[in-house]
Amino acid sequence: MDEKTKIYDITIIGGGPVGLFAAFYAGMRNASVKIIESLPQLGGQLSTLYPEKYIYDIPGYPSVRAQELVNNLIQQMKPFDPTVALEEAVQSVEKQVDGTFEIITKKDTHYSKAIIITAGNGAFEPRRLDLPEAEQYEGTNIHYFINDLSRFSGRRVAVCGGGDSAVDWALMLEKVASSVAIVHRRNAFRAHEHSVNNLEKSSIAIKTPFIPTEVLGNGDKLTHITLQEVKGDTTETLEIDDFIINYGFVSSLGPIKNWGLELERNSIVVNSKMETSIPGIYCAGDICTYDGKVKLIATGFGEAPTAVNNAMNFIDPKTRVQPMHSTSLFE
């Protein structure tokens, strides 16, 4: 059986922190695992929205930087070598005659004996730069995601936005880029006060209150942007190599609403086994709901093993739901 038709034991839809931990735990249960993620990188909101922010309610960490937590989770699951499919938004899930699930994305078709949905608040789509010519340069040097800082080494970069993501990325880029400018339509930034203080002390050129009104290029890549002062007459042209847009993201259940699952207020209803209304499909993390549900990363970390253990029992009813403790497994 080739990779395209391989039937995995467990397919995890959503590569955020809960999905990563579920992949690790499923690996401990000797399951073959695939993660399908709609974004270009693993980590979900932690990597996309606030990679440099500190999280204070993860057990065992007095504080941990969001991206560091993601990196640790990826490292934790690596020994089990799960298959990862990035930039694939799941469009439909269908149960086949033989009981396996067919999972269709915009790019491919996947097969699995059980599914765990860990999609957080749903699929993310960036709010795009609404200017003529902008779409032409998306994917070359207009960016909505950063998954490799080194690609900006020695380059002139402009960041557009005023929230945590924009300020965080500008500060990170300052360490590698030859120059960084941040463009925001208001004088005040919405980012965390500590980050704004660091921004004001940095070498980053702060362009406020300005908005981009034109992007100029040579047909192959963007070379300049024109800025217009909000409620003013001042214009400015910046010569840049890369333009990073941080206007935020829109998340929704999207196609999940059409999969036949019981829903309640844009969440998937589960029972105490983390089982949905469709046998063989489980949920963990913010996307699911039950009486008394608390939406925290720490809660999702507890739900993931419950989902995995019950999924394994669904695949093979002779399999114990309660596994051995990890101290015994790794001796």
Swiss-Prot record:
<keyword id="KW-0285">Flavoprotein</keyword>
<dbReference type="Pfam" id="PF07992">
    <property type="entry name" value="Pyr_redox_2"/>
</dbReference>
<feature type="binding site">
    <location>
        <position position="37"/>
    </location>
    <ligand>
        <name>FAD</name>
    </ligand>
</feature>
<feature type="binding site">
    <location>
        <position position="124"/>
    </location>
    <ligand>
        <name>FAD</name>
    </ligand>
</feature>
<keyword id="KW-0560">Oxidoreductase</keyword>
<feature type="binding site">
    <location>
        <position position="90"/>
    </location>
    <ligand>
        <name>FAD</name>
    </ligand>
</feature>
<dbReference type="InterPro" id="IPR023753">
    <property type="entry name" value="FAD/NAD-binding_dom"/>
</dbReference>
<dbReference type="GO" id="GO:0045454">
    <property type="term" value="P:cell redox homeostasis"/>
</dbReference>
<feature type="binding site">
    <location>
        <position position="327"/>
    </location>
    <ligand>
        <name>FAD</name>
    </ligand>
</feature>
<comment type="similarity">
    <text>Belongs to the ferredoxin--NADP reductase type 2 family.</text>
</comment>
<dbReference type="GO" id="GO:0004324">
    <property type="term" value="F:ferredoxin-NADP+ reductase activity"/>
</dbReference>
<dbReference type="GO" id="GO:0050660">
    <property type="term" value="F:flavin adenine dinucleotide binding"/>
</dbReference>
<dbReference type="InterPro" id="IPR050097">
    <property type="entry name" value="Ferredoxin-NADP_redctase_2"/>
</dbReference>
<keyword id="KW-0521">NADP</keyword>
<dbReference type="GO" id="GO:0004791">
    <property type="term" value="F:thioredoxin-disulfide reductase (NADPH) activity"/>
</dbReference>
<feature type="binding site">
    <location>
        <position position="50"/>
    </location>
    <ligand>
        <name>FAD</name>
    </ligand>
</feature>
<dbReference type="InterPro" id="IPR036188">
    <property type="entry name" value="FAD/NAD-bd_sf"/>
</dbReference>
<dbReference type="InterPro" id="IPR022890">
    <property type="entry name" value="Fd--NADP_Rdtase_type_2"/>
</dbReference>
<dbReference type="GO" id="GO:0050661">
    <property type="term" value="F:NADP binding"/>
</dbReference>
<keyword id="KW-0274">FAD</keyword>
<feature type="binding site">
    <location>
        <position position="45"/>
    </location>
    <ligand>
        <name>FAD</name>
    </ligand>
</feature>
<feature type="binding site">
    <location>
        <position position="286"/>
    </location>
    <ligand>
        <name>FAD</name>
    </ligand>
</feature>
<protein>
    <recommendedName>
        <fullName>Ferredoxin--NADP reductase 2</fullName>
        <ecNumber>1.18.1.2</ecNumber>
    </recommendedName>
</protein>
<comment type="subunit">
    <text>Homodimer.</text>
</comment>
